[in-house]
């Protein structure tokens, strides 16, 4: 998986991780956010390599399905891009409001 794909999987987990089981969300976090290898996850969780791999695949599929149906990550990134573009031509007062909007999107 390419670096950008790994970044997106981490973002998907931030957005949709609450819809996964705690176990699946934790595995995604360990693999993508903490950059742990499968062997390290196996050791940490005490399950088989195949069990870890299967759980990761199911979680990845769930996350990508959620994004393809809801598109929240795509929409949020597009809103950020548009706000940053608008900020370039905005007045000082508008820039304050844009910064507030960007802060809300970061939450």
Model-identified regions with their sequence ranges:
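Short, Lys/Arg-enriched N-terminal segment that forms or immediately precedes the first helix
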Residues: 4-17
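Short amphipathic alpha helix immediately N-terminal
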Residues: 22-34
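DNA major-groove recognition helix of helix-turn-helix
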Residues: 31, 56, 63, 67
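Hydrophobic positions on the alpha-helical face of helix-turn-helix-like DNA-binding modules
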Residues: 40-42, 52
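Helix-turn-helix DNA-binding motif, specifically the short coil turn and the N-cap/start of the second
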Residues: 48-49
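Short Lys/Arg-enriched helix C-cap and helix-to-coil transition segments
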Residues: 64-78
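Helix-turn-helix/homeodomain-like alpha-helical modules used for DNA recognition
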Residues: 81-107
């Amino acid at each position: 998986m390419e670096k950008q794909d790994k970044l997106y999987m981490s973002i998907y987990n931030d957005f949709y991780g609450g819809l996964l089981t705690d176990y699946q969300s934790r595995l995604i976090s360990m693999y993508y956010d903490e950059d742990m290898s499968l062997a390290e996850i196996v050791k940490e969780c005490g399950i088989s390599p195949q069990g870890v791999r299967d759980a990761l695949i199911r979680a990845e599929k769930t996350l990508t399905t959620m994004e393809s149906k809801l598109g929240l990550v795509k929409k949020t990134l597009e809103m950020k891009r548009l706000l940053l573009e608008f900020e370039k031509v905005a007045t000082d007062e508008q820039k304050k409001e844009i910064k507030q909007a960007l802060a809300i999107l970061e939450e």
